[in-house]
C-alpha cells in the first residue's frame, strides 16, 4: 500500500509587504509539518509583482516543494505573467492549465493545477448562448475544464493524484456564501473531469465565507481559503 503524503494547503493568503513577517512564520511552520505545500490562488493582494516578490522571498529557502495556481486577485492589475515569474523565481511551481509530478519520499504525487472560472451550477448556469461577451465567459470555463481533463489523464499513473484550483468546482463548499453570487465563485462544469478520473483530493479557495469540505462523488473537495479554515494552513494526509 502506498504511503500517505502530508500536505499543507492554503488559499487567499493575499501577500503584501505588511504581511511579510506573518507569512514567513506561517510558511516556515507549514514546511516543518508537511511534505508538500499547495497554494490555491489569490497569492497576492492586488496582483502586483512586488507583492509576489514578498511571497517568493518568504518561500525561497523552504525545504519542501510548493505548488500554486493563480487567483482572480493575481490577475487584477494585468500583471499575471510578471506575478508568475516572480513567484517562480522563489521556487514556487505555478500551474496554469498544466500539471506537475512531485516525488515525496518515493511517492509520486501528480498535481493538476488551473485557476478555474465562473459560470454557476446546475439549475443556474451561464449558457453558451447569446452575446459574444457571455459566450466568451463560457468558453473560458471550457478551456479550464479541458485542462483538467488533460492533466488528470497525464497524472493517472501517479501514486497520488490531486487537483488544485482557485474557483470552486462544487456548490457544497460554497454554503455560507450568498446564493446569488455562487455563479461568480465557481462552476459545476469543473466537476465533470474530477468525477470521471476520481483524484485523491481537490483543493480550492476563493469562497471566503464558504464551507471547508464537500465532495464530488467519492472525491473529497477542500475549501482551504484561510478565512474558512481559520488557520494559516490546513493539514491533510492524502
Which residue ranges define each predicted feature?
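A short, N-terminal amphipathic alpha-helix
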Residues: 32-36, 150-154, 192
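Short, structured coil segments at secondary-structure junctions
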Residues: 62, 90, 216-219
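Binuclear metal-dependent phosphoesterase catalytic core
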Residues: 1-4, 81, 102-105, 175, ...
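Charged helix-capping and loop-helix junction motifs
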Residues: 24-25, 50-56, 82-86, 180-189
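Active-site environment of divalent metal-dependent phosphoester hydrolases
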Residues: 14-19, 44-49, 73-83, 101-104, ...
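N-terminal active-site segment of His-dependent metallophosphoesterases
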Residues: 1-65, 75-78, 134, 138, ...
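Conserved catalytic scaffold of divalent metal-dependent phosphoesterases
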Residues: 13-15, 81-184, 225-226
Amino acid at each position: 500500500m502506498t504511503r500517505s503524503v502530508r500536505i499543507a494547503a492554503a488559499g487567499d493568503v493575499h501577500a503584501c509587504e505588511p504581511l511579510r513577517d506573518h507569512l514567513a512564520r506561517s510558511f516556515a511552520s507549514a514546511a516543518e509539518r508537511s511534505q508538500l505545500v499547495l497554494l490555491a490562488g489569490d497569492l497576492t493582494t492586488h496582483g502586483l509583482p512586488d507583492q509576489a516578490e514578498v511571497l517568493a522571498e518568504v518561500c525561497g529557502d523552504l525545504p519542501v516543494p510548493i505548488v500554486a495556481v493563480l487567483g482572480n486577485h493575481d490577475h487584477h492589475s494585468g500583471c499575471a505573467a510578471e506575478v508568475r515569474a516572480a513567484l517562480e523565481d522563489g521556487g514556487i511551481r505555478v500551474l496554469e492549465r498544466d500539471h506537475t509530478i512531485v516525488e515525496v519520499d518515493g511517492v509520486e504525487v501528480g498535481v493538476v493545477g488551473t485557476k478555474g472560472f465562473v459560470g454557476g451550477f446546475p439549475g443556474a448556469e451561464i449558457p453558451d448562448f447569446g452575446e459574444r461577451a457571455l459566450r466568451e465567459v463560457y468558453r473560458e470555463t471550457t478551456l479550464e475544464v479541458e485542462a483538467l481533463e488533460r492533466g488528470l489523464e497525464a497524472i493517472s499513473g501517479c501514486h497520488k493524484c490531486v487537483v488544485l484550483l482557485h474557483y470552486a468546482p462544487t456548490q457544497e463548499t460554497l454554503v455560507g456564501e450568498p446564493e446569488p453570487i455562487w455563479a461568480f465563485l465557481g462552476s459545476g462544469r469543473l466537476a465533470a473531469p474530477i468525477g470521471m478520473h476520481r483524484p485523491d483530493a481537490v483543493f480550492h479557495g476563493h469562497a471566503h465565507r464558504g464551507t471547508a469540505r464537500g465532495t464530488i462523488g467519492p472525491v473529497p473537495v477542500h475549501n482551504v481559503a484561510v478565512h474558512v479554515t481559520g488557520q494559516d494552513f490546513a493539514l491533510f494526509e492524502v
